[in-house]
């Protein structure tokens, strides 16, 4: 083929992924082995959020539905970004041509046509939504662009059923170049070199993490912590004793990469309490035998008022231990039960564990909460504690948090400003 086209992108400022602060810039490289009549070279910046909902157990308008007849696939496609730029011929030449579509004869050689795009502040498809269309962004006052999701995962390449259903949603951002040749009815798009024409890239709207952090810093310090109680209470045969676990935290609404999960400074899982209807004798031997912390991912796809959810569990920590609970430090609460602080940070290596330190990618996706028009990705934490009492009774507690905003970016906030050091002014003689 006599014509080749490549799209070359300038790298993102952080070297990993593009953000709202980046300008998507680069050039279209056109290689000609002989002269070609070219009418126009067009470049597009496109962001698409696509979801497919397969027949089966599903929700309609977020309510469970029973299927009486087989259903076909529902497909939903939203163009969250669509920007175009004509890079050839130059604008002054176009203006002089006054609407003429006459092509230009371009001689053999290599040509570079620069371009740049700025991301819009919100999904562009929202203004085109019909009034009755239900989306996950409906009613939002300040909707955000969603991050890339599953753009490297294809349903043709998956090896199991769970991964297949997971692959039925995708958010893809790409730059595409098209070379129009000849007259008005002719166009050229060399499919043999299609990957060079379409350049997919990873996008994360990182300013969202900063906004959540600023909201947290503005929060009233007297706001009570969230309390997450274990799903089931523990009872013992022949006894009126009843036990449960509570996780109390102000900082589980948003979790950032490299946050300490168990240290007191992290304020995530440092306030874990074993609560008892009746106090145990101080001589009792109560121990934590194992600690497990998981991240539960819930990804929901929406199409045609039907939705399917995909659940995954990611292990964050799993530690065997022989931690003895100090029952002498138990306290009576105003509600009448007894509580004992279980200091998980005293268990090695829990005190060293930071959230997503390895920058893990699940099915090729960074750990990041988001809502798009038709894809919702949420996360919860799940804490399992395995207990022994007097070496005889063995039981387990499970605490599940509310949905948490997860970010793949790390943030650092000083707990207090550094001490002010007064410097002596120099003396001049």
Swiss-Prot record:
One of its GO terms (molecular function) is protein-macromolecule adaptor activity. The keyword Cytoplasm applies. CDD domains: ART10-like. It is found in: Cytoplasm. The keyword Cytoplasm applies. GO terms for cellular component: cytosol. Belongs to the ART10 family. This is Arrestin-related trafficking adapter 10. It comes from Lachancea thermotolerans (strain ATCC 56472 / CBS 6340 / NRRL Y-8284). The gene is ART10.
């Amino acid at each position: 083929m006599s014509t080749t086209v490549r799209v070359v992108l300038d790298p993102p400022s952080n070297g990993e992924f593009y953000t709202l602060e980046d300008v998507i810039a680069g050039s279209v490289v056109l290689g000609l082995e002989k002269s070609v009549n070219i009418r126009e070279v067009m470049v597009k910046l496109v962001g698409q959020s696509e979801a497919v909902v397969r027949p089966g157990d599903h929700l309609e308008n977020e309510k469970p539905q029973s299927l009486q007849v087989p259903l076909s696939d529902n497909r939903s496609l939203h163009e969250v970004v669509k920007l175009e730029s004509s890079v050839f011929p130059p604008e002054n030449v176009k203006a002089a041509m006054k609407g003429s579509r006459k092509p230009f004869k371009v001689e053999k050689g290599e040509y570079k046509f620069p371009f740049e795009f700025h991301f819009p502040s919100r999904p562009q498809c929202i203004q085109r939504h019909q009034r009755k269309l239900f989306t996950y962004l409906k009613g939002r006052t300040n909707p955000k662009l969603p991050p890339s999701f599953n753009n490297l995962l294809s349903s043709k390449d998956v090896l199991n059923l769970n991964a297949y259903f997971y692959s039925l949603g995708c958010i893809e951002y790409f730059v595409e170049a098209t070379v129009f040749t000849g007259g008005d009815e002719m166009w050229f798009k060399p499919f043999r070199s299609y990957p060079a024409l379409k350049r997919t890239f990873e996008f994360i709207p990182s300013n969202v993490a900063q906004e959540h952090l600023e909201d947290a810093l503005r929060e009233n310090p007297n706001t009570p912590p969230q309390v997450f109680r274990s799903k089931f209470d523990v009872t013992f045969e022949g006894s009126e004793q009843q036990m449960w676990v509570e996780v109390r935290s102000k900082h589980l609404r948003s979790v950032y990469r490299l946050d300490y999960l168990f240290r007191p400074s992290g304020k995530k899982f440092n306030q874990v309490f074993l609560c008892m209807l009746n106090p145990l004798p101080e001589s009792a031997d109560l121990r934590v035998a194992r600690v497990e912390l998981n991240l539960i991912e819930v990804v929901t796809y929406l199409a045609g008022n039907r939705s399917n959810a995909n659940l995954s569990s990611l292990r964050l920590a799993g530690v065997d231990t022989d931690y003895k609970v100090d029952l002498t430090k138990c306290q009576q609460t105003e509600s009448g039960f007894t509580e004992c602080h279980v200091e998980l940070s005293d268990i090695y290596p829990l005190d060293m564990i930071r959230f997503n330190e390895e920058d893990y990618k699940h099915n090729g996706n960074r750990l990041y909460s988001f809502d798009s028009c038709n894809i919702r990705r949420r996360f919860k934490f799940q804490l399992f504690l395995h207990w022994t009492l007097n070496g005889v009774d063995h039981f387990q507690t499970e605490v599940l948090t509310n949905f948490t905003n997860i970010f793949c970016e790390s943030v650092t906030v000083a707990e207090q400003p550094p001490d002010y050091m007064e410097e002596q002014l120099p003396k001049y003689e």
